[in-house]
Amino acid sequence: KSEESNYSRINLQDSEDEIRKKIKKAKTDSSPIPGTIEELKDRPEALNLLSIYSFVISSTIEKTLNTMKGREFSKFKNDLSDALVATICPIGKKIKNLKNDQSYLLKILHEGTEKANSIAEKNLDKVKEIVGFVLH
């Protein structure tokens, strides 16, 4: 099995530079952005990037095509990078902060353990009653 390229995905903890580099290297063709989805049917890489952009900016692919029609992908990739950086980098920073806050993580683990034990105890009591292991 071949090793999956790190450029095949954008990770939540990627830096701004990593995101921009990955988008810049993303495969596209030399044709400009079309105006309709039908024109993208044989251009899966272009459709993928336009779909990602539409999702990140909370738009539809149709609206994105209408706005971007005729633009070169090299310029579009800058807009896509900006949108991804604005969305993903704050998440990555939050993840990093949470990972570095050991007391908070231990508190969450403790609360989760207590909640799980409470639920498990109730379920086990029900099972014992159904099976007949409960002494009255």
Briefly describe each language-model feature range:
Residues K1-H136:
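Conserved nucleotide- and phosphate/pyrophosphate-binding catalytic cores
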